[in-house]
Design a protein with these regions (language model features):
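A short, conserved alpha-helix in the catalytic core of glycosyltransferases
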Residues: 29, 34, 40-57, 63-91
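Active-site rim elements
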Residues: 62-65, 97-99
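Activation segment
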Residues: 57-58, 96
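Short, basic, helix/turn surface patches
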Residues: 109-117
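Short, flexible, basic/aromatic active-site loop/helix in glycosyltransferases
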Residues: 5-40, 52
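A structural signal for well-ordered alpha-helical scaffolds and beta->alpha junctions
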Residues: 7-8, 12, 42, 71, ...
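Active-site donor/metal-binding and catalytic loop motifs
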Residues: 83-106, 110
């Protein structure tokens, strides 16, 4: 989310997908542009990868990122291996509002140290 926040508005044209937030599994759905789209980054609320892709490429989660930035790092690693990313219409509820706490800031610094941007 933070990657597409211009400070006053979310750049909807750069986003894809949908999700429910909160404790109610049938809550209000937030839409972020069309789904079934190619993407550069995916939110880690739900990531799916073919087993043969992992076996053939060595794609792995970096253990430096145990909660924050594991998803962004995983996606960038996948893209650096020439893999494609995309969204698909799957219904789920994310029961976390997220936070920008000290742990997030520490992981962000680690992410910047690895990727440089």
């Amino acid at each position: 989310w933070f990657a597409f926040n211009s400070g006053s508005e979310i750049l909807d044209h750069a986003m894809s997908g949908m999700i429910c937030h909160g404790n109610d599994p049938c809550g209000e759905i937030s839409y972020f542009g069309p789904w079934k789209q190619s993407c550069e980054l995916l939110d880690g609320v739900f990531l799916a990868v073919r087993l043969n892709t992992i076996a053939n490429t060595g794609l792995r989660f970096d253990p430096r990122f145990d909660f924050h930035f594991y998803d962004v790092d995983f996606c960038r690693t996948a893209r650096s291996l020439g893999l494609r990313l995309g969204t698909w219409p799957i219904a789920l509820t994310h029961q976390s509002g997220g936070s920008f706490d000290d742990e997030w800031r520490s992981s962000h610094a680690e992410y910047l140290a690895k990727w440089g941007d």
